[in-house]
Amino acid sequence: MEPPYVDHYFDGALMHIFNPDTKENGGIFSQTQGWAILAESLLGHGDRAFEYFLESSPANMNDKAEVRILEPYVHGQFTESTRSPYAGRSHVHWLTGTGSTVMVGCVEGICGMRPNAEGLVISPSIPHTWDGFKIEKNFRGKHLSIDIQNPDHVQSGVKSMTVNGEAVEGNFVCEC
């Protein structure tokens, strides 16, 4: 929100009760980062999805620890924006859904592990520089060793895959 409200009163809208550039009054909320990762993945933009993951990673902000003022391994709910005297400071780190939305963006988006009623769709969207990756996953009582190779260095699309050492047709693992 730009510009933030500077007059404080409460009419039912939260933006009026917070200082400018914090929380709902112009702060930068983090929870949407996971959805951006997932959206780019679903569009097949593996490079951009992984770029968003890296940009939102708490570890990526360790060189700004004195500004961020949070543990180096947690997401904050929001970050104070540029007009704040504390621009870049993050808050409410143990009371946010950011970690879970980023996890969904990474697991279901980048790694492409999307469960449905019949089984598991595997449709990764990865950086074109990756040669592939392996995942060990327990899924509905079964252990899966999934090996995804990317010899053509594409960002999305599954030509073939192996699960528990056996070739699987398509990109679906049946629950049966």
Annotated model-derived regions:
Residues Y9, S57-V67, S125-K137:
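Short, mixed-charge aromatic SLiMs
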Residues G44-D47, S56-K64, I110-R114:
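A generic secondary-structure signal for well-formed alpha-helical elements
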Residues T22, Q33, L43, F78-C176:
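Carbohydrate-active enzyme catalytic cores, enriched for enzymes
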Residues M1-F29, M61-Y86, S156:
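Extended glycan-interaction surfaces of carbohydrate-active proteins
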Residues Q33-A49, F53-S56:
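Alpha-helical support elements that line or immediately flank enzyme active sites
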Residues A13-L14, G27-I28, E51-S57, F172-V173:
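Catalytic and substrate-binding regions of extracellular carbohydrate-active enzymes
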